């Protein structure tokens, strides 16, 4: 689409991007993000000792982008989606939610609640479907559904990584 992409990575593995910066997210400075139209927070923290970094890093990025026109797009999780129109019940709190993902989903919910308090940043929290399929091909179809859990005609909540990535760029 003609976008210029810069990837910030904390490890030695370099993704397929035009520009790669090897720097831990908490070491990123405001000058590192100068001139960017958008910053995508797709950080993955999975272990009990790193889960709190979801909140810490999103607030760090928010501080860096405060008062700028740069958009902060945050890759969230389905667990924070609401199960009701009154927004009183979230997927992560449902008995059917897989126990092994509950700590991660709770950390991402905390991340969402932390960024909600920031009116000084242009942010969007993008939750994928409940089934987030890495091996599925791009179909060119996805649904933007707000903050409520939705399913397709077959009663499934599913999106491929590829379609989700397109949705993030389209936003």
Positions of predicted regions on the chain:
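Oxidoreductase cofactor-interface core, primarily capturing Rossmann-like NAD(P)-dependent enzymes
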Residues: 1-6, 11, 68-72, 79-171
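Short beta-strand segments at enzyme active-site cores
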Residues: 41, 73-75
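Short, catalytically relevant binding-site loops at active-site mouths
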Residues: 45-48, 78-82
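NAD(P)H-binding glycine-rich loop region in Rossmannoid oxidoreductase-like domains
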Residues: 12-68
